[in-house]
């Protein structure tokens, strides 16, 4: 499977780097208006990323998704959809049991920092392809605090968004790995492991 980014093609296993509570009125504004006070298209919601990145000074790899899904936003943590293979994949690669609680997930991943490229956007449900008016996360705060050796984008959307919004600021390319999303059904857990294990 190939991903096309600005006229270039990358294989899904490519290791090349290029890489508070709201009042009723404010809730209505959040749903129907973006920060520029322009009406949102039907089905869209303006959403703010509400949970912090996972990393410490020992983190060496930074894994970036695009933006939390509806289920992740409900659970207030990354990759909350039960069919997303991310946590199973990480446990397999690190040869540890699959973490169940948020604390277990954080502990497992401290050597591998975790965040998303986008901190707010207009989005329809969980659809990455519907993202509009994206505001990028300040990836530099992690790069300044930890000696990150490799930045990995979890899927093509995260990769494209990183190249567009973050790479010009950080000066650091990202490597593209195939998405762990259930939407990427072409990749079994075994195929994902084969690609991700390169890092």
Cite the ranges covered by each PLM segment.
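Polybasic, lysine-rich low-complexity intrinsically disordered segments
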Residues: 1-2, 17, 29-30
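Short, low-complexity intrinsically disordered segments enriched in A/P/G/S/L with frequent Arg
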Residues: 8, 25-26
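C-terminal capping/extension of enzyme domains
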Residues: 28, 32-60, 81-82, 124-140, ...
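Structural motif
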Residues: 60-61, 150
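Short, surface-exposed acidic-centric catalytic microdomains
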Residues: 71-130
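Internal catalytic-core helix/loop-beta-alpha segment
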Residues: 111-158
């Amino acid at each position: 499977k190939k991903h096309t980014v600005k006229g270039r093609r990358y294989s899904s296993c490519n290791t090349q780097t290029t890489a508070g509570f709201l009042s009723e009125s404010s809730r209505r504004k959040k749903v129907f208006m973006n920060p520029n006070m322009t009406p949102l298209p039907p089905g869209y919601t303006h959403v703010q990323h509400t949970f912090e990145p996972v990393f410490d000074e020992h983190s060496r790899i930074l894994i970036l998704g695009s933006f939390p899904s509806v289920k992740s936003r409900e659970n207030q943590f990354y990759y909350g959809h039960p069919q997303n293979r991310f946590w199973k994949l990480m446990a397999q690669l690190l040869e540890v049991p699959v973490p169940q609680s948020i604390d277990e997930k954080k502990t497992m991943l401290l050597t591998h920092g975790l965040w998303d490229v986008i901190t707010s956007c207009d989005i329809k449900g969980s659809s990455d392809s519907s993202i509009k008016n994206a505001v990028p996360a300040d990836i530099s705060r992690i790069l300044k605090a930890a000696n990150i050796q490799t930045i990995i984008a979890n899927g093509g959307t995260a990769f494209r968004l990183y190249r567009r919004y973050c790479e010009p600021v950080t000066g650091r390319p990202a490597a593209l790995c195939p998405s762990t999303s259930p939407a990427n059904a072409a990749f079994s857990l075994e195929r994902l492991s084969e690609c991700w294990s390169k890092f």
